[in-house]
A protein has these predicted regions:
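Positively charged, low-complexity nucleic-acid-binding target-recognition regions
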Residues: 178-283
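Short, glycine-/Ser/Thr-/acidic-enriched flexible segments
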Residues: 21, 53-55, 74, 84, ...
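Short amphipathic beta-strand/extended segments with alternating polar/hydrophobic composition
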Residues: 17-32, 60-62, 85-93, 247-251
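An anion-binding catalytic pocket shared by soluble metabolic enzymes
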Residues: 31-51, 220
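Short polybasic amphipathic segments
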Residues: 5-7, 11-17, 75-82, 236-242
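Acidic carboxylate diad motif detector
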Residues: 1-40, 183
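Substrate-contacting helices/loops that form the catalytic groove of nucleic-acid
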Residues: 42-190, 267-283
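Short beta-strand-initiation
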Residues: 2, 32-34, 43, 64-66, ...
Length: 283
């Protein structure tokens, strides 16, 4: 670890006064006050982390413009709101494809290793794992940045995230379970959302999401046990209200997540709430 007396940022470059590193000039977009530079060991290499301090805006106390986020797999993040603008869905199928390819390739390589060398792991497997992890990390960064940029554009002051300790796994157990049973670091995604939101003065609230998937937003139901009926969630990811209206099932859950924390936020009616989300593909 190098303290800020051993390095500095000047004209868009990280410069080192520490003798072994003096020849290096590393371009950076860091704008805040440099605190330290640390080198974190990984599998066969190191990553450099720049720790810096910025003056974050004060987080608002009152919640007026609110979004709710339902986290899943195919629909990685479904974002509802109470301001009447079109909701959005972050497509998660690309992450699913990362894991399917990784699980398949990993199984093939491990099978070959066991037969040929009586081994379970190799440098090639480590490279495959690192590549998968880097792709997912990049996706989480871009997805969280997209959401925060959207919130800033629409003047959102509060984000409510539905949290489930077991996280939904939509894949069905079958002979392809190793390709389809997906492990996505949702907690890391929430952490990225939190610090990006904090830097913009946006409040983040995590709430448990019980009864949000089986209660009806379109029928103005509260997400409580007495209203729970998951039988209204029909095929193709749709939720059917008591009056026969259809809404994206995850979007219904995202609206109900808002009502978990602010049950009266839609007291002026739900007519202005969007029921047809836009799907975004994050690269």
């Amino acid at each position: 670890m190098l303290k800020n007396i051993q390095c500095k940022i000047k004209e868009g470059y990280l410069i080192f006064s520490w003798k072994p590193f003096r020849k290096f000039r590393i371009p950076t977009k860091v704008k805040g006050k440099l605190m330290q530079v640390r080198f974190v060991p990984k599998s066969g290499y190191y990553t450099m982390e720049i720790v810096y301090q910025i003056n974050a805006p004060e987080i608002t106390i009152e919640s007026k413009n609110i979004v709710g986020i339902d986290i899943g797999i195919d629909n990685f993040a479904t974002i509802s709101n109470n301001i009447g603008t079109t909701p959005i869905i972050i497509n998660g199928r690309i992450v699913k494809s990362f894991n399917q390819y990784y699980n398949k390739k990993k199984a093939e390589l491990q099978a070959d290793l066991k037969v040929r060398h009586k081994m379970d792991w190799s440098k090639r497997l480590q490279r495959l794992t690192d590549k998968r992890n880097n792709k997912i990390s990049n996706f989480l960064h871009n997805a969280s940045k997209t959401i925060i940029d959207w919130c800033v554009f629409y003047g959102i002051d509060t984000i409510i995230i539905g949290k489930n300790d077991n996280w939904k796994q939509e894949s069905k157990m079958s002979k392809k379970v190793n390709q389809n049973f997906i492990q996505i670091p949702h907690a890391l995604f929430i952490d990225k959302l939190k610090y990006k939101a904090e830097n913009k003065g946006i409040k983040v609230i995590c709430t448990e999401e019980s009864y949000t998937s089986g209660t009806s937003f379109l029928d103005s139901e509260l997400p409580i046990k007495e209203n729970y009926n998951k039988g209204r969630r029909i095929k193709r990811g749709l939720f059917k209200s008591n009056t026969g209206k259809l809404i994206n099932a995850d979007l219904n859950g995202a609206y109900q997540i808002i009502k978990k924390v602010f049950p009266n936020v839609f007291t002026n009616g739900i007519e202005g709430a969007g029921s047809h989300p836009i799907r975004l593909n994050i690269i």
